């Protein structure tokens, strides 16, 4: 592949002129510009993106770090971010941290070296964010709010209302023994959902019952077994997310339970799988696409010198499907 010096020689111009044509940083005589473009086309020359980024202090890259790309919530979130980035002339670089702080810091260092224009991140590590404050590029947190972090923008759903909505729906469906499969309580969104569950239980005089659970399908299978052993009279289950709701359904039906006649199940997120699965999962929907697009817009607005909203909270919505059934 030709170098910028070779392109300049073939076009009869200086390397600086070739650079100006590529970057559009200054006016170039049209005749010279056409000569340069013709040589670029003939030689297949491609500019070094990293070198350009280092020179311009911008790569038009938005970094995204998520804890588990296998979780459909995060893959759908990444899709929304990429689409919004592309529409605005940016590229997305996706990193998977596996909830590993060391990997988070390594990915942040890499993005900093690449002169990323911003970072959208899902993390529960205050230490990671503390390190971010020294890197100088804009950061948006998604889904998880960290303590003592006031300067970083966050985009999330109203998880507290989501917990209330899920619990109230099961009560309206006639459930009296409701078990909440609460997500990890070091994660703010999981804490808020469980708090919503607790408050509705108190309001309606329902006994609080819970199983600690993660967010994966495999964990859901294990925890569903634990739940049915610990709470044999359960008639309503709030799963930590839709994938766990699906694993709960599988476990219960294998044990001979009819859903929703014997036990009703509600998930959280409204991932695509929740309506492709049979029966379709009743869920509390997060506006995943809106969250991803908003996070991306904040990065771009920051880069363009605009003021940004630090706290961005989206409403959630009950989606009634086939794993719950109202009385009557």
Which residues make up each language-model segment?
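N-terminal helix-turn-helix DNA-binding module of bacterial transcription factors
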Residues: 1-59, 325-328
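Short histidine/acidic/glycine/proline-rich micro-motifs that form metal-
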Residues: 23, 68-71, 99, 183-188
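Conserved functional loop/turn residues at catalytic and ligand-binding sites
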Residues: 12, 17, 44, 58, ...
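ATP/adenylate-binding site constellation spanning eukaryotic-like Ser/Thr protein kinases
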Residues: 15, 33, 59, 78, ...
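Short gly/ser/thr-rich secondary-structure transition/capping motifs
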Residues: 42-48, 102, 120-123, 221, ...
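Alpha-helical recognition/docking segments in bacterial nutrient-uptake
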Residues: 2, 57-168, 227-229
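Bacterial carbohydrate/catabolite-sensing allosteric modules
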Residues: 42, 83-88, 137-141, 145-328
């Amino acid at each position: 592949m030709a170098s910028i010096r070779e392109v300049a020689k073939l076009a009869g111009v200086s390397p600086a002129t070739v650079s100006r044509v590529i970057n559009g940083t200054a006016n170039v005589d049209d005749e010279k510009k056409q000569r340069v473009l013709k040589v670029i086309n003939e030689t297949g020359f491609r500019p070094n993106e990293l070198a350009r980024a280092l020179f311009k202090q911008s790569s038009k890259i938005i970094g995204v770090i998520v804890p588990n790309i296998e979780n459909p919530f995060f893959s759908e979130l990444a899709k929304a971010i990429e689409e919004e980035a592309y529409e605005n002339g940016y590229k997305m670089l996706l990193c998977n941290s596996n909830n590993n702080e060391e990997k988070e810091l390594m990915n942040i260092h890499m993005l900093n070296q690449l002169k990323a224009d911003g970072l959208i991140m899902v993390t529960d590590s205050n230490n990671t964010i503390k390190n971010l404050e020294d890197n100088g590029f804009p950061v948006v947190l998604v889904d998880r709010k960290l303590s003592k972090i006031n300067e970083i923008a966050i985009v999330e759903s109203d998880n507290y209302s989501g917990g209330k909505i899920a619990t109230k729906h099961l009560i309206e469906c006639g459930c009296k023994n409701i078990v909440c499969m609460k997500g990890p309580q070091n994660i703010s969104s999981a804490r808020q959902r469980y708090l919503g569950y607790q408050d509705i239980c108190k309001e309606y005089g329902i006994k609080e019952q819970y199983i600690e659970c993660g967010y994966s399908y495999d964990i859901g299978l294990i925890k569903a077994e634990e739940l049915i052993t610990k709470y044999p009279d359960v008639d309503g289950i709030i799963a930590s997310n839709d994938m766990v709701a699906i694993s709960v359904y599988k476990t219960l039906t294998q044990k001979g339970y009819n859903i929703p006649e014997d036990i009703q199940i509600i998930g959280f997120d409204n991932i695509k799988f929740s309506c492709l699965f049979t029966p379709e999962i009743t869920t509390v929907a997060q506006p995943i696409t809106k969250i991803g697009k908003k996070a991306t817009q904040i990065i771009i607005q920051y880069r363009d010198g605009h003021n940004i909203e630090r706290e961005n909270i989206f409403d959630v919505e009950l989606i009634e499907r086939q794993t719950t059934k109202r009385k009557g």
